[in-house]
Amino acid sequence: IRAYGNGYESMGLGEYPVAASSDAMFFQDLIVQAATGFATVGIAGTENILGSLNGVFFTDANTSKPTFANHLLAANQASDIKALVNDSPIQQYEIRSNNAGASAQTDVGNTADIAYTAGSTSNFVSGCTLDDSTLNNNAAQQIQVIGISRDPENNDLTSANVVWRVIIKQSLFNDLTGV
């Protein structure tokens, strides 16, 4: 029918149902496919990753108007919530490390899990970071470092909280065991 995941030719977003009264989802949070069949926020060690949240679309339960937002508030009562997810299994992402000290070029190629922190309620942006304490070569981890950010303000390995370029290792689209 077509390639799985979405690429630039389709705006790069897949639509996934979200259960009513679900947990809050912030812009660029890691989104996973739960065994319930609904998309939800991924935490450290979660498998079946779909991608990162670009926004949500739903019919507002109070106004009955179609609504797009870059986040989903917890306990949203809408019954038609769709998560709009950057879900290409070959998508590159940038993520800030939680390392308070210097990082090393030798971290490139290693895998890691994320450290989940709820996003900011002032701008609704994800608080997820790369958990530097999990950096190693374990194939069962969530993401793999493929390089340092190309942004000159975020690519100093001697500074705290460097930004890495990563790919998803535990993608639902590449997982052979199912949900």
Task: Give the residues covered by each predicted segment.
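Surface-exposed, low-hydrophobicity beta-strand/loop segments enriched in small/polar/acidic residues
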Residues: 1-179
